[in-house]
Amino acid sequence: MKTVFCSFGLLMAAVPVFAQNTGKDSIVSTKALDDVVVSASNISRVGDHLVIYPNSQQRKHAVNGFGVLENLNIPGLIIDAKSNQVDVMGLQATLYLNGQECDIREIQMLRPRDIEKIEYYDAPSGKYAKDKLVVNFITKQYRYGGYVQADGLQTIGYDHGDYNVATNYVKGNNSYTVFAGANYSHVDGTETWNNENYQFPQSLFDRESYSKNSYRNHQKYMQFRYQNQKGKRYWVGKFTLVNLSTPRNASSGFAKESTETDIFSNIRKKSLSPKIDLNANLPLSKNQTLTLGVHGKYSANSYHRLYQEQPFEAMTDEDENALSFQLSAIYNYFSQKHSLSVELFHYHDVWNADYSGNCELWQHLWKGESLAFFSYNFQASRRLSLKTRIGLDWLQYHLHGDNSFSQLSPRINTNVQYQLNKGMLLWSFNFVNSNHGMDVINRAMIQVNSHMMEKGMPELKKSHDINTYLYYMGRFNRLSVSAIGQFRYNHHPLTDDYYLDEANGKIVKTYSNGGNAQYYSAILALQYKLCKFANLSGDIRYNHAEVKTTWSKHNNNLTGNLGLNMFMGDFALKPYLHFGKKSLDEAALVISKTPIDYGMSCSYSRGNLYVELQVVSPFKKQEKQYWLDLPICSYSKSIKDQTASQYASIKVAYSLDFGRKTQKVEKDVNKNINSSLLRVE
C-alpha cells in the first residue's frame, strides 16, 4: 500500500530530473575513527574523499561508468555528454580510472557490474592535487578470460549515430584490449537570424541576414592497449589513432543592407592524429609510491573556408602539423597523520602552419611549460585536516619572427577541511597563472565577411587568477545537502577585442588581455529519497560575472535544475528539467539566453542487455539567443539548432564473456585534436 501511494504521488507531482540519483541506502548513523568515517551505508568518508560502492539499482540501471556516475548520490552533479565535462557545484571534476586520468567518453565501454567502487575526492591531494574535484573509478581485477562488447546509439529527429566495439583478453597479470568505433552527424535545417551593426567613421552599416545550415561530420578511432598489473604496481601502454572529417559545413541564405544579396559559406576540416601513452605506478615501500607518465601526440590538420557575398569573396586554406609530448613524475609519501608529495611536469608543443588564399603566411610556434610542486598534508585532529601545495610554473613560447615570451609564476593551493557529525566543510584558496591557447598566439589575418577581418595576437601580457570557495556537504537520513560560495578574480583575462583598420576599411576582431574580471556564484543542491525506488533532486544557482577590459560587461543569472529517478524492476524512468539561463561569455563578451530544456529517458536492463530510449524537448524547437553590444560593432543573433531539441535517441548495448569473467576495460580514447590554427567557425 505504501508503494502504491508513493507511486501515485510521484505521478501526480510529475517533477523532472537531472543527472543524479540517490542510492538505495543512506547514512543513518556514523562513527568517527581518526580520519575515517564509518557509515551504515554504501558511502563512507576516508580522509580527503568519499568511497562509494554502487548498489544494485545504481549498477543495473546504467549502461556504463557514465551511467553509474549519474546514479550516484552526489548533490549538484551535472554531466554534459556533448562537451564531456562533469560539473559538481559549479566546479569541473576530473575523471580517473584505476588512478589514470580520462574523460567521460573514455569510460563508455566500462560495464557497471565490473565497477568495484568509486572514489570521489572533494579535497584532492597526492597524485590528484592538481585537480579541483576527482572521480576515480576502481574496477574489479580478474585473472583469466575475456569479453566482446558492442554498443550503438541512433537519433531520430536528426541523423546521428555512434557505434563502438571492444574486445579484451586477460591472462594472469597481463591484459590485452582493442577498441574501435565510429560516429557521424548529418544535420540539415539549423536556422540563424542575425542583425548586425558596424560603426565606421563616415557611416553606420545595418545588416540583416538569414541562413540555413547543412552539416556533415565523421569520426573514426581505434586503440590497442597492453597492461601489466600486480597489486598496486602497474604499467600501461596505449596506441591510439583518431581520424576526424567535416566534409561539409555549409550555410546559405541572404544578407540585406541597402539591397539584398545572396550569401554562402562552407567549411571543410579533417585531422589524422596518432598518440602514444605510457603510464606506470611503482610502489617503493608500504607508504611510498612513484607515478610516471610519458605521452606523445602528432596531428595533421587541414582547414578550408569559402565565403561568398557578391561581389565579395574570401577563401582561406590552412595546413598544419602539430607535435606534442608530456612528461610527469609524482612521488608520494604518507603516514597516519602526515603525507607529502613532490610533482614534476613538462608540457611541450610545436606547430607548423601554412596559410594560403586571402592570407599568405607560414608560422612556426613552440611552447613549453614546466611545473614543480611540493604538497604537505597534516591531520591536525580527528576532524581537522590541512593541505598546502606550493610550486613554480615556467611558461615559455616563441612565434617565428616575434620576441620570445617567458613567465615564471608561483602556484599556491591551500585547503582546510573540517569533518562535522553528518558532513564536511571545506575552504579552498588557489593562486595560478593563466595559460592561453596557441590558436590565439599567431599573426594570421583572415576575412570573415565584407565588413570584418579576424587576426591573432602574439603580444600578450602576463596574467594570473585567484579562486577561492567555501564548500559544504551533509547527509541527514533521507536528505543530502551541498552548498558552495565561490569567488574568482582574473588579472589580465583574455578577451575578444575590436578596432578599425582604416587602410583596409574593415573592423578587425582580435584579442587583448588587459584589465580584470570577477565572478561570484552560490549554489544550493538537495537530494531526497522519496521511497525505496524513487528519489528527487534539484538545485538553485546564482552567479554574477563582470569583465572590465577595453570594454566593460556584466551579467546576473538565476537558474536551477529539477529531477526524478524511478527504478521499477528491470525498468528505470528519469525525467529532467533544466530551467532557462542567461550567461556571459567572459572571453567573447557575448551574452546568451538559453530556454528551458526538458526531457525523459526510459531504460530496460536485464542480464548483458541494456536498451535506453531518450526524448529531448519534444514539444517545441529551442531558440537560443546571443547579443554583442559594443560601440564599434554589435549583433543580435537567434539560432534554432536541430541538435538541441525535438529529437529522440535509442541506445542498445550488449556484452559477451568468454572463459572466466574479466573486468571491462575503460575506453581511454582522447579524441581531441591539437591545433593552433586561427579559424572562423
Regions found by a protein language model. Give the residues of each.
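N-terminal periplasmic accessory domains that precede
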Residues: D35, G65-V68, Q85, Y120, ...
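Flexible loop and strand-edge segments within Gram-negative outer membrane beta-barrel domains
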Residues: S185-S324, V350-W351, Q363-L365, A444-V448, ...
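Periplasmic plug
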Residues: I78-A123
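Exposed, low-structure sequence patches enriched in small/polar residues
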Residues: A62, N73, E101-L110, D114-Y120, ...
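Short, polar/charged loop or turn motifs at beta-strand boundaries
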Residues: D25, H49-L72, Y96-N98, G152-I156
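Short strand-turn segments of transmembrane beta-barrel domains in outer membranes
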Residues: N55-Q58, Y144-T167, S209-K212
